[in-house]
């Protein structure tokens, strides 16, 4: 009976690059038998550190925080770390366990980590807080990754494999560039930031059913159906790579707008309190707080895909064709305007106040609207993807691969500043609308303003990989280059 290794096509993904030193990275494994059960246990441990090599850029720090930028919703990382400081000092481990009985087996993978810099050290602007965060975004923790059963079989002489459980499935030929064919699994972004990270640490397995089957000696088919949806885990707010500060779970008090002057906010609240329109200042004096509403996660059902692969002997090349329907793993920032009744109260108060102090009326209306609006994170559903790929080896031994992907309805994030200022559209002071042109988007009282538009996106990319043996005392040097082109249509 001919079988194939069910783990032979592990995903390739972009690695975050930073100045990092891996101080130790021992790896070891053991094999064992329990009667007729074959087992293996592999482990990898590492200790590493990363440093900031540039001073904070004032243009990326909001004016309310002493910089020159227009927003303070994405500057915490610049305020927390100075040039020369470590932003990560981490110990981590990852372990694989496989148990196999004949052609059937189970595979488990888990990891743990502890970042001493983020967990134990004090930060200059905002301390790193793990409260309410996703486990994978925390400064320390442990997580079960893969957990699936598999069975290898053959129909005649044609091998096949089936898997069920939490797993990673990789399609396409991308190595570094994202948003290509490989979109089945979400990403643990934080894991890729850590020094000494491995690809298997940063891919988030999800529950799915997966089947692969050879149809001929040269043609094979694959398919999957996901049983659950999961999201990409982004950097915790305030960490070195965090961008922006308002998306990660638990980072609910970081979206602050308008004035950060305490006296001005107190004056505005004195005016607004009588009408029940008080606003909340940011805990870090960054401005007036815009509340975060509940996330709107995608549904679990409706995610599936199919692939065909053909190996052309005469060309020594494998070709692939793919179709996938999936829900976004990436967060979209969206807004919800103040309710119609709240806007009516704001406009009534501002109109009466304008007879006494027009400037204060406009400020009060803007503050009350912002402080009584909210934002939310959502994940658009039913994204369709079509793809083609090839992979070959050139006569000089260089591996050459490439792919093209097409999404007719990919969600593209709108400018978040436009989303926020669109919430001021309904402000009306004595019939005048002072913020009518504050945004290119149109906001309405109490209505959702979805922060994306569906666009056609086509992406081409190609990769070259060459191995050089026995270089400068190393057994092998790997040189990888990748180039891509992305077109956003109407």
Question: What does each of the following model-derived ranges do?
Answer:
Residues 37, 73-77, 87-93, 140-145, ...:
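Residues that define the transmembrane beta-barrel architecture of outer-membrane proteins
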Residues 101-104, 154-158, 204, 216-218, ...:
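Outer-membrane beta-barrel channels and translocator barrels
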Residues 43, 93-99, 108, 146-151, ...:
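Residues on the lipid-exposed face of transmembrane beta-strands in outer-membrane beta-barrel proteins
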Residues 39-47, 104-110, 160-162, 221-223, ...:
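Transmembrane beta-strands of outer-membrane beta-barrel proteins
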Residues 100-256:
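Outer membrane beta-barrel
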Residues 32-73, 106, 110:
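Transmembrane beta-strand segments of Gram-negative outer membrane beta-barrel proteins
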Residues 47-53, 103, 112-116, 166-170, ...:
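Transmembrane beta-strands of outer-membrane beta-barrel pores
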Residues 59-78, 119-133, 185-194, 237-290, ...:
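Solvent-exposed loop segments that connect transmembrane elements
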